[in-house]
């Protein structure tokens, strides 16, 4: 007889199927509702949801195992507490002073963002202005033609002024070139170097826009005098150099007025913010008094 029609094997499969059918349990929704209703009537306690496992699981023995060591109930309670604590999310541990914050320190607020944008704009303006004026001074020094009749003290003055002009602008260009890439790389965050290098940013701005421009005016006057003296007409050199004196005075005056107006505007804005904050606090205090007064009268 073929193996597929073996009566003993067929009988064995039937017995196994009947056994599985006997062990199968069927639970309906009505059975669950009935069990819950029965539990409510018997216990009378509110239904507490089972704690779901969260992050950072701990072993059951970690929940206060050092307490109640002497008794069995204490051990059971500790095990239960440890299990419950292992299913809850742990609170983040507070950072101590010894911990090093290696993460990103976040973005700046509005006032600090204004300082960041201002420092970035100052560095960009300093780099452009310094590169332009330093190159112009070097070209003038090289392209000027000098004769034997040119005054030697005048050549010394020209060399000194040109050296100072190029040195000041190169210093400003160096500082702006070194700081600006790191500011653009870090972005408007607390990791930006403008917070600690504010002195160098202001120094670069001072060299490029104040000292550098004044030296550039002096350089133009000396070049005029050298050029017109070389052609035998020093009177034109005197006139053009004299015209630069009121220009320099106006330059210094405008620089002072712009700086003064900027400072006064900043102080005025700060005063307005303080006054607005005081008004807000006064209104809030009056609201609190108005809400507290009726309750006090009722209590009396």
UniProtKB/Swiss-Prot annotation:
Which keywords has UniProt assigned to this entry?
A: Membrane, Transmembrane, Transmembrane helix
Highest taxon of source: Eukaryota
InterPro entries, alphabetized: CRAC_channel (IPR012446), Orai_sf (IPR038350)
* Cytoplasmic domain ranges by topology: 1-128, 175-205, 259-300
| TM region(s), chain numbering | 129-146, 154-174, 206-226, 238-258
The entry's cellular-component GO terms read: membrane
Q: Name one GO molecular function term.
A: store-operated calcium channel activity
- S-S pairs: none
**Key word tRNA-binding present in the record?**
no
- Record carries keyword Plastid: no
Write out the annotated subcellular location.
Membrane
Q: Which residues lie on this side of the membrane: Extracellular?
A: 147-153, 227-237
- Summary of the function given for this chain in its UniProt record: Ca(2+) release-activated Ca(2+)-like (CRAC-like) channel subunit which mediates Ca(2+) influx and increase in Ca(2+)-selective current by synergy with the Ca(2+) sensor, stim-1. Required for Ca(2+) and IP3-dependent contractile activity of sheath cells and the spermatheca. Affects brood size and somatic cell function.
Q: State the family it belongs to.
A: Belongs to the Orai family.
* Protein name, entry field: Protein orai
Please report the organism this UniProt entry assigns to the protein. Answer: Caenorhabditis briggsae
């Amino acid at each position: 007889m073929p193996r597929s029609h073996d009566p003993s094997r067929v009988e064995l499969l039937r017995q196994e199927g009947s056994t599985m059918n006997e062990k199968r349990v069927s639970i309906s929704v009505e059975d669950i509702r009935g069990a819950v209703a029965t539990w409510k009537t018997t216990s009378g306690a509110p239904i507490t949801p089972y704690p779901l496992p969260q992050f950072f699981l701990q072993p059951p023995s970690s929940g206060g195992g050092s307490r109640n060591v002497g008794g069995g109930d204490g051990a059971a309670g500790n095990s239960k507490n440890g299990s419950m604590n292992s299913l809850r999310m742990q609170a983040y541990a507070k950072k101590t002073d010894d911990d090093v914050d290696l993460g990103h320190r976040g973005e700046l607020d509005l006032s600090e963002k204004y300082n960041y944008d201002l420092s970035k704009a100052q560095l960009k303006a300093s780099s452009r202005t310094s590169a332009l004026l330093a190159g112009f001074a070097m070209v003038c020094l090289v392209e000027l033609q000098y004769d034997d009749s040119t005054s030697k003290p005048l050549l010394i003055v020209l060399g000194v002024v040109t050296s100072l002009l190029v040195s000041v602008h190169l210093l400003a260009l160096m500082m702006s070139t070194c700081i600006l890439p790191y500011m653009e790389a870090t972005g408007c965050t607390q990791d930006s170097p403008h917070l600690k290098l504010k002195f160098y940013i202001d120094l670069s701005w001072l060299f490029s826009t104040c000292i550098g421009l004044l030296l550039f005016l002096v350089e133009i006057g000396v070049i005029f005098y050298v050029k017109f003296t070389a052609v035998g007409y020093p009177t034109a050199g005197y006139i053009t150099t004299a015209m630069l004196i009121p220009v320099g005075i106006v330059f210094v005056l405008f620089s002072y007025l712009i700086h003064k107006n900027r400072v006064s505007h900043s102080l005025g804005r700060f005063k307005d913010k303080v006054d607005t904050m005081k008004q807000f606090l006064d209104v809030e205090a009056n609201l609190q008094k108005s809400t507290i007064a009726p309750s006090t009268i009722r209590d009396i």
